[in-house]
Every structure is written in C-alpha cells, then in structure tokens.
C-alpha cells in the first residue's frame, strides 16, 4: 500500500507559482515586495490605497480651505479699514462733498465737526446720486510774504468740473517762485520741493515770475492743496487773485437734512436702497469769511450681518469645490488602477497561451502575493537570478529595452505586448516608441 506523500515531496512536485506584474518595477527585492503589497491592497474588498489617497486629498484641501478663509477675513478687514474706515476732510466756503456708501456693508454714517467754530454746515440724505449741476463763483485775494527756502499754502475741496483762474504778481522783479497744486490736504513736504522729480509727480507745477495767469480745470472731486514755495536765498512777496468757479451738488431732492446743531450728524442707511450723503458749507456772501474752514470726520458703522452672510457663502462655495475635487481625484485614481489591472491580465493571458506558466489568471491574482514573498525570501543564487528575469512573467531573462527611455525590465515578448497594449514604460510612464531586443553573443 502506497504511503501518503509527505508535504516536502509535494512541494517539489508542484509547479512553480505564477507571478503577476508588480506595481513597483524596481530590480531590488524590497521594491518587489512593496509592489506585491500594493496589489493586495488594490484587489481587496476595502481599497485601502484609494481611501488613503482620498484622505490625503482632503487633508491638503483642508489647508487650502484654511488659507482661503484667512484671506477672506483679511480682505474683509482691508475693505472695512480702507473703504469704510474713518476719513478726515477739510471744507472751505462754497464747497460740497458727496459720500456714497454701500447699503449692504454700511449700517450708518456719522459726520462730526472736529474743530467746530462757525455754523452753516448742512448734511443731506438722498435715495440716489444728486446732480452735480449747481455753479457758484467766488474769489479771494492773498498777499504772501515768503522767506527764503520756505513755502505757504492752504487747501480747497473742489468737485469735478470746477475751474481755477490764478492771477499772480511776484516781487521784487526778477524773482521766481514755484506754484504747486497737488491732491490732498496735508501740505507739501519741504524736502521734496528741491527734488526735480517731484514736479513730474505733482498734479500741477509751475515756475512763476513777474505777472501772469494760470488756469486749472479740476477733473476729479477731491481735496487739493495750493502752495507757493520760495527756494531762493532771498525773501519774496507774492500777490494772488484766485477766481473759483465751483460746481456743487443739487440738494433740492433730499429726503433728510441735519444742521450739525450739536456738532455731529448721523445718517442711517437703508438696506437694498441707494444711499447718498452730501455735506455742504455756506457761501462767502452768507456772513462767512473766505478764511473760514471746517474740518470734519466721516465714520461708518458696518453692517455685521452682511459680513457673516458673506463668510458663510464663501465657506459653502469652498466646501462644494473641495467635494468636487475629492470626487474627481479619487475617481480618477480608481480608473487608473483598473486600467493597470486589465493590462496585467492581458499580459498574463498571453503568457498562459504559450504554455510557459500554469494556472489561470484568477488563480494568479489570488496567490501572487504569497508566491512573491516565498520567491523573494530565497537568498544567494536564486536572488541574483530573479534580478535578471523578466519582471512581468519571471520565466525568461530580460532581453530587451525600451526607446526612448532605455529601461530594461522585461523580456522581448512581454515588452512587445506592453507596447501594443498600454504603450508606456512601467518605470517612467513615458510613451514607448520601440522595443529593441538585446542579443547575447
């Protein structure tokens, strides 16, 4: 009676296991084992590699989400401080200034007179922008004694379309001074008057001597500072006659009026309705001197609910974008794995047709990881021989290389099959143009 074969004899009688393509195509044994582990994770019921890749996408998008949210808060802060932060404005006689805040971001406007001295200021509220079509003519004369290397100046607030006619006389004869008109009400720094490049950056610069006239047209509503500078080594006297044709806003259609009885006025903006505020100063003929001036401050109370809603909308938009990004990248990763698996199946099927390996393709998928570990566990000659075998079929030596990359990882038959199926090198993923056989002499 025949005795049962021992397990050791069965191991020698069985054919060598069929190994499939590994994800890693490195020639080292450790890289081959890692590739087999990747395949095991790919074909399991729970795809751990897809899950971990999606988690990495979510983690990176979380950083992007935090950065974008920080940028939004920073932009909101800049919007509040620059557009709707406190602003100081100087007003002279026969002036008017228009302020149009957004009813979405601004709840109310507070106008306060900082150096309250003369009455006459008026605040008007409108549903829409009033017409800029009221013309007022007024004039002033100034005699300035300017010492050497100094200047004198004063501000105006002028609306677009206003005209300035400046008639001048400089004494003594032969003396020259600079007549500068620049945007702003802070004056002209003494240090920049000697800079030749300053004249190209200022709104209007003229070197005047003797007698003459200069006409200026205002194209932007703003504060302007007029200065007369003497950079010579002797004192001069300058006579100026300034005729102003000012353009003011029409206040007849206003629905709100405040006369600054206590030095300040507050205008409550209405939501989803246009809001405009005009502050006017009295004319010089109404008991007001040409030298009278008002220094006022505009301050805004923000509408907090608008910023809260805006932040919520930004967060929702970013969450939706991140969700679409995750789905796109994860679904793209799954499709790529499926394509590689199908390519491996076709390669192994071609090898099975040649009779060089045993077992079905399904069996090889089920047992390739265990066989690979057993195969790569051998040392010495077997390990060196495995480095020279085809990384696809492990049956014949590597006898080809790919053009143009030059990698050599398979036999000529497997390389030709890869070129026909996928067409890309498994090492660098570059497109293969040719598969060249290596002949051994």
From Swiss-Prot:
UniProt xrefs under PROSITE patterns: ZF_RING_2 (PS50089)
Gene disruption phenotype: No obvious defects during the vegetative developmental stage. The double mutant lacking both APD1 and APD2 exhibits an increased percentage of bicellular-like pollen at the mature pollen stage. Plants lacking APD1, APD2, APD3 and APD4 are defective for cell division in male gametogenesis resulting in severe abnormal bicellular-like pollen phenotypes.
Keyword tags: Membrane, Metal-binding, Transferase, Transmembrane, Transmembrane helix, Ubl conjugation pathway, Vacuole, Zinc, Zinc-finger
Topology with respect to the bilayer: Multi-pass membrane protein
Classification via InterPro entries: APD1-4_M, APD1-4_N, Znf_RING, Znf_RING/FYVE/PHD
SMART domains per record: RING (SM00184)
Biological process according to GO: mitotic cell cycle; pollen development; protein ubiquitination
EC number: 2.3.2.27
GO cellular component, one term: plant-type vacuole membrane
Pathway: Protein modification; protein ubiquitination
Subcellular location: Endomembrane system; Vacuole membrane
TM spans (from-to): 60-80, 305-325
Zinc in keyword set: yes
Stretches annotated zinc finger (RING-type): 390-429
PANTHER family: E3 UBIQUITIN-PROTEIN LIGASE APD1-RELATED (PTHR46858:SF5), OS05G0521000 PROTEIN (PTHR46858)
Known role: Involved in pollen mitosis II (PMII) regulation during male gametogenesis.
Protein name: E3 ubiquitin-protein ligase APD1
């Amino acid at each position: 009676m025949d005795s049962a074969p021992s397990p050791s004899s069965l191991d020698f009688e069985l054919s060598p296991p069929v190994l499939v393509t590994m994800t890693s195509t490195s020639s080292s044994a450790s890289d081959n084992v890692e590739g087999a582990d990747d395949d095991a994770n790919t074909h399991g019921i729970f795809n751990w590699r897809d899950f971990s890749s999606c988690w990495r996408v979510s983690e990176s998008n979380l950083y992007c989400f935090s950065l974008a949210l920080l940028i939004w808060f920073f932009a909101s802060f800049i919007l509040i401080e620059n557009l709707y932060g406190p602003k100081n404005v100087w007003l002279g006689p026969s002036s008017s200034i228009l302020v149009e805040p957004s009813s979405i971001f601004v709840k109310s406007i507070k106008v306060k007179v900082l150096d309250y001295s003369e009455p006459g200021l008026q605040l008007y509220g409108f549903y829409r922008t009033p017409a800029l079509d009221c013309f007022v003519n007024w004039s002033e004369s100034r005699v300035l004694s300017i010492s050497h290397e100094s200047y004198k100046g004063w501000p105006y607030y002028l609306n677009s379309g206003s005209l300035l006619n400046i008639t001048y006389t400089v004494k003594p004869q032969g003396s020259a001074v600079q007549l500068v008109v620049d945007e702003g009400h802070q004056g002209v720094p003494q240090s920049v008057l000697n800079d030749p490049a300053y004249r190209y950056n200022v709104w209007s610069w003229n070197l005047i001597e003797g007698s003459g006239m200069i006409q200026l047209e205002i194209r932007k509503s703003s504060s302007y500072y007029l200065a007369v500078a003497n950079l010579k080594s002797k004192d001069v006297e300058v006579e100026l006659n300034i005729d102003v044709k000012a353009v003011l806003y029409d206040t007849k259609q206003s629905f709100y009026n405040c006369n600054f009885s206590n030095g300040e006025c507050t205008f409550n903006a209405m939501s989803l309705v246009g809001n405009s505020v005009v502050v006017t100063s009295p004319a010089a003929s109404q008991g007001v001197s040409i030298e009278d001036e008002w220094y006022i401050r505009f301050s805004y109370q923000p509408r907090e609910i608008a910023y809260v809603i805006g932040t919520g909308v930004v967060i929702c938009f970013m969450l939706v974008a991140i969700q679409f990004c995750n789905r796109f990248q994860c679904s793209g990763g799954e499709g790529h794995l499926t394509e590689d698996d199908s390519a491996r199946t076709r390669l192994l099927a071609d090898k099975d047709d040649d009779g060089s390996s045993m077992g079905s393709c399904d069996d090889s998928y089920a047992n390739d990881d265990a066989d690979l570990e057993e195969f790569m566990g051998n040392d010495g000659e077997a390990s060196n021989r495995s480095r020279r075998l085809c990384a696809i079929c492990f049956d014949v030596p590597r006898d080809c290389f790919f053009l143009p990359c030059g990698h050599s990882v398979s036999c000529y038959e497997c390389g030709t099959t890869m070129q026909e199926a996928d067409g890309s090198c498994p090492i660098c993923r570059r497109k293969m143009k040719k598969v060249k056989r290596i002949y051994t002499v």
